[in-house]
Curated annotation (Swiss-Prot):
This is Polymerase basic protein 2. Keywords: Cap snatching, Eukaryotic host gene expression shutoff by virus, Eukaryotic host transcription shutoff by virus, Host gene expression shutoff by virus, Host mitochondrion, Host nucleus, Host-virus interaction, Inhibition of host innate immune response by virus, Inhibition of host MAVS by virus, Inhibition of host RLR pathway by virus, Inhibition of host RNA polymerase II by virus, mRNA capping, mRNA processing, Viral immunoevasion, Viral transcription, Virion. Belongs to the influenza viruses PB2 family. GO terms for molecular function: RNA binding; RNA-directed RNA polymerase activity.
Length: 759
């Protein structure tokens, strides 16, 4: 206030005003400051000063032919003086106004296409809803967030190649467009931007916004998807927040969200299979998200989440060096430790073998709803400063930190036995045993931890064992803070290795991730996830398993048919029949299998009993380990729709219905595809027509390899011999004719020869 009075006083003296407005600036340092270098030192002042002049703009000479010298009001629009140092004309801002009102109009068709990201943003804001403003303390933490909605996920290099190809197709320089997305985008954009008059540089900038993910490290206290980040300045201040619902989704957020769901489902499923790593890879390679291959998304998408990172590690991609424990991301900020095996006794006198970290270390812990700074020594928590959205979230963070500290009082707080198992029914490792135990009930842990008197520190309060805040006392070493802890900002990625059980380690051998760390939360994906792998059939329940199993048999019928007659055991062991077993009542699985296998053997032995529909219908039942018994069945039970439903051994049922006239198969009323029966089942002797051009030599001869299906015969060279599977599961040896002339007689002789060869 005093300063302002003093300044007012000075300004009231006429001499002061004169000095400030009239005297020249002749101090060399000042002149140097404002005249050296190309960088404008005071842009806003320069702009105001320029615009105060009569002709602040320079333009190409052609302007004098396109714009009149004076406007309707008689004001001069351009000066006859040319600009010093260039052959351009000096122009008044009024000329711009004249041009905007009266200048030529070009086509506007390309604007929405080039400035797509802006048009889309306007639509989202138009349809978005802003709710009330709440005043409260905002716990913001810096997170790496995506700042431009609606982008594809190309790398900078890939995008550069696409932009060059679209905007400057005639420029020299090698451009390699390899990925599917690059080619699709290039084709689409070239068509959209035909005859586009917008400056190529502008088009290039806008394309970059559409193609590349841009991230910033920003303080956020709420939604982190890009449609929330674009309105960050409207939704959260230092002491207020405004509720907001976006007026539309964007594909990049949908992909991130769906990728996490797919990865979680796949890791959970792989963990319970015989070879988790192989299963995980098989599923990643055969899954599509919104029509794009999951492996392509994983290669490009920087989302960091436990399940996603396990999938990336399995594919040999680099991931972040932070590790995960109890759903929190830990990043060591200082210190170091060595690992040593140690045996400890729980409060229940159970022996646990834990890997103790010896040494002083500091970590940041970042979770979905709480963050913390942890300082620990060997088996001792030195200090934990935690902040979170609510009491529950803060408690979660405290439990994780206490377990992670490996303190003795934590291990002694265990009541009862530790025998938690994972989805595959294997015992969890000791650290996760402890974690699960205290996540169920942490009362004893908090009671036994110990409390201490605390000093009054700004922004920090103590917390008592019952989670109430206090300014005098607190659990030992633990404080709650108003300020959040920032996420780890570095985008550095490290090489990791993964073992058969999906444990991911860094090059020092520290475990960064394991399936135990994968969240059990189930969400609904925003994009369609198509799991082609049979391991994921059960994700949509028993009906889906039933339909998928039969669809698989129909799709692969040609090869299935050959295996059925040649190598049934190999067929029965196919992993595609695994999910089906869960539908068959456990007590009778073995008997069903034995019965069906015997039935199939009879079909192979007795001529003319081959029945396509029946084989397809019963095949999945033969996959279980068979029990030999004399039992005969007229129907087999499957558990779907919450009860046992019957599949008739002979004939149709609601579960399995084949319509002979339309050739359509319906499973539980759902269409499962077209089934082409073998020709001989309806009319005998049709193979003879199919085998025209081949000479039948006699019975199957194993030296000529496995039996081919009739469709595969066309690949044979003239004179080449092969075994071929004909109609009723019979195999004969044939030779492709060397001359075409004798083809006509094949039909008559084939029928006789087939009968001879078989009998």
């Amino acid at each position: 206030m005093e300063r302002i009075k003093e300044l007012r006083n000075l300004m009231s003296q006429s001499r002061t005003r004169e000095i400030l407005t009239k005297t020249t600036v002749d101090h060399m340092a000042i002149i140097k400051k404002y005249t050296s270098g190309r960088q404008e030192k005071n842009p806003s002042l320069r702009m105001k000063w320029m615009m105060a002049m009569k002709y602040p703009i320079t333009a190409d000479k052609r302007i004098t032919e396109m714009v009149p010298e004076r406007n309707e009001q008689g004001q001069t629009l351009w000066s006859k003086m040319s600009d010093a140092g260039s052959d351009r004309v000096m122009v008044s801002p009024l000329a711009v106004t004249w041009w905007n009102r009266n200048g030529p109009v070009t086509s506007t068709v390309h604007y929405p296409k080039v400035y797509k990201t802006y048009f889309d943003k306007v639509e989202r804001l138009k349809h978005g809803t802003f709710g009330p403003v709440h005043f409260r303390n905002q716990v913001k933490i810096r997170r790496r967030v995506d700042i431009n909605p609606g982008h594809a996920d190309l790398s900078a290099k890939e995008a550069q190649d696409v932009i060059m190809e679209v905007v400057f197709p005639n420029e020299v320089g090698a451009r390699i467009l390899t990925s599917e997305s690059q080619l699709t985008i290039t084709k689409e954009k070239k068509e959209e931007l035909q005859d586009c008059k917008i400056s190529p540089l502008m088009v290039a900038y806008m394309l970059e916004r559409e193609l590349v993910r841009k991230t910033r490290f920003l303080p956020v206290a709420g939604g982190t998807s890009s449609v929330y980040i674009e309105v960050l300045h409207l939704t959260q201040g230092t002491c207020w927040e405004q509720m907001y619902t976006p007026g539309g989704e964007v594909r990049n957020d949908d992909i991130d969200q769906s990728l996490i769901i797919a990865a979680r489902n796949i890791v959970r499923r792989a963990a319970v299979s015989a070879d988790p790593l192989a299963s995980l890879l098989e599923m990643c390679h055969s899954t599509q998200i919104g029509g794009t291959r999951m492996v392509d998304i994983l290669r490009q998408n920087p989302t960091e989440e436990q399940a996603v990172d396990i999938c990336k590690a399995a594919m040999g991609l680099r991931i972040s060096s932070s590790f995960s424990f109890g759903g929190f991301t830990f990043k060591r900020t200082s210190g170091s430790s060595i690992k040593r095996e140690e045996e400890v006794l729980t409060g229940n006198l159970q022996t646990l073998k834990i890997r103790v970290h010896e040494g002083y270390e500091e970590f940041t812990m970042v979770g979905k709803r709480a963050t913390a700074i942890l300082r620990k020594a060997t088996r001792r928590l030195v200090q934990l400063i935690v902040s979170g959205r609510d009491e529950q979230s803060i408690a979660e963070a405290i439990i994780v930190a206490m377990v992670f500290s490996q303190e003795d009082c934590m291990i002694k707080a265990v009541r009862g036995d530790l025998n938690f198992v994972n989805r595959a029914n294997q015992r969890l490792n000791p650290m996760h045993q402890l974690l699960r135990h205290f996540q169920k009930d942490a009362k004893v842990l908090f009671q036994n931890w110990g409390i201490e008197h605390i000093d009054n520190v700004m922004g920090m309060v103590g917390v008592l064992p019952d989670m109430t805040p206090s300014t005098e006392m607190s659990m030992r070493g633990i404080r709650v803070s108003k300020m959040g802890v920032d996420e780890y900002s570095s985008t550095e990625r490290v090489v990791v290795s993964i073992d058969r059980f999906l444990r991911v380690r860094d090059q020092r051998g520290n475990v960064l991730l394991s399936p135990e760390e994968v969240s059990e939360t189930h969400g609904t994906e925003r994009l369609t996830i198509t799991y082609s792998s049979s391991m994921m059939w059960e994700i949509n329940g028993p009906e889906s398993v039933l339909v998928n199993t039969y669809q698989w048999i129909i799709r692969n019928w040609e090869t299935v048919k050959i295996q059925w007659s040649q190598n049934p055991t190999m067929l029965y062991n196919k992993m595609e029949f695994e999910p089906f077993q869960s539908l068959v009542p456990k007590a009778i699985r073995g008997q069903y299998s034995g019965f069906v296998r015997t039935l199939f053997q009879q079909m192979r032995d007795v001529l003319g009993t081959f029945d396509t529909t029946q084989i397809i219908k019963l095949l999945p039942f033969a996959a279980a380990p068979p029990k030999q018994s004399r039992m005969q069945f007229s129907s087999l039970t499957v558990n779907v729709r919450g009860s046992g439903m019957r599949i008739l051994v002979r004939g149709n049922s609601p579960v399995f219905n084949y319509n002979k006239t339309t050739k359509r198969l319906t499973i539980l009323g759902k269409d499962a595809g077209t089934l082409i029966e073998d020709p001989d089942e309806s009319t005998s002797g049709v193979e003879s027509a199919v085998l025209r051009g081949f000479l039948i030599l006699g019975k199957e001869d194993r030296r000529y390899g496995p039996a081919l299906s009739i469709n595969e015969l066309s690949n044979l060279a003239k004179g080449e011999k092969a075994n071929v599977l004909i109609g009723q599961g019979d195999v004969v040896l044939v030779m492709k004719r060397k001359r075409d002339s004798s083809i006509l007689t094949d039909s008559q002789t084939a029928t006789k020869r087939i009968r001879m060869a078989i009998n």
